[in-house]
């Protein structure tokens, strides 16, 4: 034994140790994971277990939902184009139909006209159509607020915006009433965070969004995403994830980053789901494997780095 090279000596010593003290070896591995989970928690990143640490360490594909993850999720109204009504009337109609919605665009509409609650508002039969918008009875009028697909499904033609931006179209009792353009800002630190993730071993960055291609493409290009899927309905996002999962390597994993609320089904379809801004969100705690308490996207590469140290 003493004539062997030192690496071979070390290997033989490890074999003897594991055979003699298997429990100690198991404990040391578990302690490494526990230490990593503790280190992440100090940064406001909560990991549900050892398997989640391992899945993060193996991640080579990371999929991002756009709104509230890559962007701030705080929309501002940039342009109002009314048809046969005033700008104020168009905004009020849209905000009223969206009075119960938790979508960031709905918040922007309500803020624009000063709606704070649904109290004393005559809004009934509200239906949120995933990937489309909402329909509601406002007063005694049927209102649709959403994208072109929603209105066209009900035989209503939309006027295409002459300016850039995400368009919210409005129709009342089957008649087109105009559109509202909104914009969101890229989250601070997003570019640096994505570049750091590449250094940590993420080989493919994917952006999924319901936004039209003309809005999503400049953002994806600016942040150097490898793959963009735009104008997606919720079921389209599931299909995109299924494709990525079926084409991953045998020793790699797919991670999805979202808010854990609007994308709960997506979190459950990947190897590791990461929820941003999870503080106070019961849905995020239920669906995600990793919870980033705030929305600091710069913590993602830190989480990946910590997971690799444990594996």
Features from the language model and the residues they span:
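Membrane-embedded alpha-helical bundles of multi-pass transporters
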Residues: 8, 39, 199-202, 223, ...
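Re-entrant/interfacial helical elements at transmembrane boundaries that shape
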Residues: 27-38, 76-79, 108-112, 287
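Cytosolic catalytic headpiece
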Residues: 48-272
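Hydrophobic alpha-helical transmembrane segments
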Residues: 1-64, 220-221, 226-230, 298-300, ...
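Residues within alpha-helical segments
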Residues: 14, 37-38, 95, 107, ...
């Amino acid at each position: 034994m003493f004539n062997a090279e030192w690496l071979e000596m070390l290997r033989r010593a490890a074999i003897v140790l594991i055979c003699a003290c298997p429990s100690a070896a198991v404990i040391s591995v578990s302690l490494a994971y526990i230490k990593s989970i503790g280190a992440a928690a100090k940064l406001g990143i909560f990991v549900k277990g050892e398997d989640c640490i391992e899945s993060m360490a193996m991640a080579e594909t990371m999929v991002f939902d756009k709104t509230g993850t890559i962007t701030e999720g705080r929309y501002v109204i940039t342009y109002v184009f009314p048809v046969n009504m005033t700008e104020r009337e168009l905004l009020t109609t849209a905000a009223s139909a969206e009075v119960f919605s938790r979508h960031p665009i709905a918040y922007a509409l309500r803020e624009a006209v000063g709606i704070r609650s649904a109290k004393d508002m005559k809004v009934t039969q509200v239906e949120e159509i995933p990937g489309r918008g909402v329909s509601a009875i406002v007063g005694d009028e049927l209102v649709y607020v959403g994208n072109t697909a929603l209105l066209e499904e009900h035989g209503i033609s939309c006027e295409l915006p002459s300016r850039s931006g995400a368009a919210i179209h409005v129709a009342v009792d089957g008649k087109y009433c105009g559109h509202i353009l909104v914009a969101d800002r890229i989250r601070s630190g997003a570019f640096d965070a994505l570049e750091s993730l590449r250094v940590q071993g993420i080989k493919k960055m994917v952006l999924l969004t319901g936004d039209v291609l003309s809005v999503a493409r400049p953002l994806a290009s600016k942040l150097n995403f490898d793959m963009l899927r735009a104008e997606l309905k919720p079921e389209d996002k599931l299909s995109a994830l299924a494709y990525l999962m079926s084409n991953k390597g045998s020793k790699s994993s797919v991670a999805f980053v979202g808010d854990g609320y609007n994308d709960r089904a997506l979190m459950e379809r990947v190897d590791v789901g990461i929820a941003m801004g999870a503080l106070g969100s019961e849905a995020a705690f239920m669906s995600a494997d990793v919870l980033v308490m705030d929305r600091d996207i710069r913590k993602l590469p830190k989480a990946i780095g910590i997971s690799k140290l444990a594996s």
